[in-house]
Amino acid sequence: MDCYTANWNPLGDSAFYRKYELYSMDWDLKEELKDCLVAAAPYGGPIALLRNCWRKEKAASVRPVLEIYSASGLPLASLLWKSGPVVALGWSAEEELLCVQEDGAVLVYGLHGDFRRHFSMGNEVLQNRVLDARIFHTEFGSGVAILTGAYRFTLSANVGDLKLRRMPEVPGLQSAPSCWTTLCHDRVPHILLAVGPDLYLLDHATCSAVTPAGLAPGVSSFLQMAVSFTYRYLALFTDTGYIWMGTASLKEKLCEFNCNIRAPPKQMVWCSRPRSKERAVVVAWERRLMVVGNAPESIQFVLDEDSYLVPELDGVRIFSRSTHEFLHEVPVASEEIFKIASMAPGALLLEAQKEYEKESQKADEYLREIQELGQLIQAVQQCIEAAGHEHQPDMQKSLLRAASFGKCFLDRFPPDSFVHMCQDLRVLNAIRDYHIGIPLTYTQYKQLTIQVLLDRLVLRRLYPLAIQICEYLRLPEVQGVSRILAHWACYKARAWDMRDEDVARAINQKLGDTPGVSYSDIAARAYGCGRTELAIKLLEYEPRSGEQVPLLLKMKRSKLALSKAIESGDTDLVFTVLLHLKNELNRGDFFMTLRNQPMALSLYRQFCKHQELDTLKDLYNQDDNHQELGSFHIRASYAAEERIEGRVAALQTAADAFYKAKNEFAAKATEDQMRLLRIQRRLEDELGGRFLDLSLHDTVTTLILGGHNKRAEQLARDFRIPDKRLWWLKLAALADLEDWEELEKFSKSKKSPIGYLPFVEICMKQHNKHEAKKYASRVGPEQKVKALLLVGDVAQAAEVAIEHRNETELSLVLSHCTGATDGAIADKIQRARAQAQKK
C-alpha cells in the first residue's frame, strides 16, 4: 500500500490529490495544441481540434482541418473547414460540436463530423464581428455567449431553443476585458468581466460593479477567472500573482493563495468533487501545473508537453500529445484504506483478505480486531465504495474480494450495494477501454445515468456494446435493447452502399416485432436522407396505420396513403387523406381516385352532405346517380330556397331526376308536393294564416280548425285522401275546437267509416262524458262493452257482456268493478259465468 500511495500529494492537512494516466495517446498531431483551437467535452467526452487556425500568420491560404477524436485519441472525424474564421469551439451537453465564427454564425456538427444545423447570434455581429466566445452548460441546456467588436455581450442560455439576449453595456468600456466568464445565479445566466481592477456583473437588465470579499490590495488587473463545474465557486488570478477563491456571488471568500508567478496562466480550472475536503484550483502555464487551495503549500507538476485542461465534476482531465491523465482529490474511502499506517476498518479488512490468500493466521487476527470494534459492516462498505473510485481493474478486484470476504462473516448484510458496484464497474471498465475511449469515473457515471451513457454509446455507433450493457444490467426492453436497435436501424437506413430491398430486409430481420420500435420513425429517418423508396418499404412493416399514413402523405404518396387508411378502417384517418388529396389533385383526378375506392367515396359523400353540397351534386352528376341527385334537389329546395317559385323549380328538377332513375313513385310524390305548395300559397293569399310547409294532413286539419270544411273536403278529394283518414282528421280537429254541435252534425252526416268508438274516445280525452254517452249508444255490438266502460257505465256494460256471453268481455267488465259499489255487478257476472259453464 505504501507503493500505491506514491502518486498521492497532500494539499494541506486534510486532503490528498493524485494524478494517474487514463490513456497513452496515439493520435498523430502534426502541430502543438497551442496552435489549435481545442474543445473537449466533459464526462469523458470527445476532443475537437481545429488545425491551422487563422491566428497563425503562416499558410493563411491553406484550409484548416477540423478533427474530432475520442478521449483515447482515436480519430472519429476529419473534415476541411470551408466556412469562415472560427473564434471558439465547444461541446453541447448532447455532444454536438458548436463552432462560433467571427461573423456570429454558429455551426453545429455531430460527433462524426456530420453537419447538423446553424444559427446566428444576431445582426449586430455582422457589423462588429465576434472577438471571443464561451460555450457553457446550465440545467436548461447548453448556451453560447459572445463578445462583439463593439464590446457588447450577447448570449443564449439554450441553443436548442434559441432566445438571444443582448446584455447591458458596460460604462466606459473602450477595449476588450482582460478576462470574462459566464455564471449562473438562481438559474439565470450572468456574465462576469474584468476591466482593469474592476469587476462587472451583467444580467439581462443591469450592469453592476462587484468587489470580491477580502481581496488583497494592490490589484490593478485580473488576468484569468474560472468558475467551478457546478457554478458555485469562482477563482480569480490577479496581476499580483494571487489567486482569490470564493463563492460565485463574490460575497464569501474561501482562501487566497500567492503563486509568486505574475505571468498570466494559459488555463485555470477548478478541481473538486462532491463533498470535497479541500477544494482546489488547477493553474497551467507553458510547462508548469499548480494545484492550489486553502493551504500554505501547493502541489506542482512539470509539464513535458503542451497540455490542455478539461474540468470535470470530480476532477480535471489533462491531455497532451502523448498522454491523457486524470487529476482529482483522493476520495475519503480510498484515503482511509490506503493511507500509510491506516487502522481504518477497510484497511484492516483488505489486509485480512490478503493474509487469508496467503493462508496466514494474521487474517484471523485482523478480522477479530475489526469484529471486536464492531466495524465489520463499515469495513465492507468502505471496500465497496473505494473499489468504485479505483481506475485499475486489479485494485478494484482486490477491494471487492476484501468486501466479499468480510460479508462472509456478517449474517444480514444486504447484497445490493456489492452487486450493483460489481455491475457498475464492469460497465465502467468496458467503456474505459482504449477502443471505446470514454474514461468516466464512478461519480460521473452516477451523475450521468445509464440512459445517457447508452445514448452516448449509440452516438458513437457502438451498438453491440450498448446492447450487451442493456442485457447485462437487465434493463427493460423498451428502455434498453429496443431503443438501441431503433437507433441502429435509423443509422442503417442511411447506408448508401446497400440496395433499398436489402436494407429493409436486414432491418426487419434484426428488429422483427421488437416492442418499443417504431418502423415509421426509421422510415422517416430514411426519407430525411433522401431514400424515399426505402422509407416506403420500411412502412410495410409498420403495424399501425396511423403512423404509416402521415409519413406517406409527407412523401407525396397520397394514393398509397389512402389505401393504407382504408385498410385500417379508421374513418378519421381516411378523412385526413381525402382532404389532403383534395388540395393536392385537380378536381377530375380527385374524383377519379375516389371512384376506385368505394369506401372513400362513401365517406366523402357524407362529408359533402354537411360541408360541400355543390361538390356532392358534381359527384352524383359524374356517376349518373339520378336517384341521389333527385334526393339532393329535394333537400336543396328546403335548405336554400325561400321563394316558392325557386322551391318548385328545384322540386321539378328532382322529379325529372326521379323519372330518369325510373322511380315513378318518387317522381309522382314530388309532383304532388309541388301541387301542394302551390295550393298552400293560394290558401295563404286567400285565407291568411300559415299553410306553407305543412304536410297534407296538417293542411286539411288547419282548414277544418279554421272552419273551412268545404275547402278541406275539396283538398281531400284533390289528393285522394281516403274517407277513413279524412274522418279521423275532422274528428280530431272538431274535438280540439270543442265544437260539439258541429261534431254531432258531422257524425250524422252519413254512416261513419271509422265507427263511433273513436267519437267516444276523443270526447273522453276532452273530458266530456256527456257527449261521449251520445256516441256510446251508437257503437256497434262488438265494441259496445268497451264504449260503455269508457263512459263509466259498468252496469250496462255488464248487461251487454252477459247478453253476448263473451268471456273476454266479462273479464274486462269484472276488472272495472271496484269496492262495494260494484259488488252486486261482480256477483251477477260470476253467476252468469257459472251458468255458462254448466251448459
From Swiss-Prot:
Q: Tell me, what is one Gene Ontology molecular-function annotation carried by this entry?
A: actin binding
Q: Name one GO biological process term.
A: vacuole organization
Location in the cell reads:
Late endosome membrane; Lysosome membrane; Early endosome; Cytoplasmic vesicle, Clathrin-coated vesicle
What's this chain's function? Answer: Plays a role in vesicle-mediated protein trafficking to lysosomal compartments including the endocytic membrane transport and autophagic pathways. Believed to act as a core component of the putative HOPS and CORVET endosomal tethering complexes which are proposed to be involved in the Rab5-to-Rab7 endosome conversion probably implicating MON1A/B, and via binding SNAREs and SNARE complexes to mediate tethering and docking events during SNARE-mediated membrane fusion.
Tell me where on the tree of life, at the top rank, the source sits: Eukaryota
According to the record, mutating residue 52 to K results in: Down-regulation of VPS16 expression in mice; mice exhibited obvious abnormality in the behavior and significantly impaired motor function
Q: Coiled-coil segments, which residues?
A: none
Q: What is this protein called?
A: Vacuolar protein sorting-associated protein 16 homolog
| Annotated family | Belongs to the VPS16 family.
Name positions with the PTM 3'-nitrotyrosine: 4
Keyword set includes tRNA-binding = no
Topology class, membrane: Peripheral membrane protein
One GO location term (cellular component): lysosomal membrane
Keyword Transferase applies: no
PANTHER family xref list: VACUOLAR PROTEIN SORTING VPS16, VACUOLAR PROTEIN SORTING-ASSOCIATED PROTEIN 16 HOMOLOG
Q: What is its main location?
A: membrane
UniProt keyword annotations, A-Z: Autophagy, Cytoplasmic vesicle, Endosome, Lysosome, Membrane, Nitration, Protein transport, Transport
Q: Give the start-end ranges of region Interaction with VPS33A.
A: 642-736
From which source organism is this entry?
Mus musculus
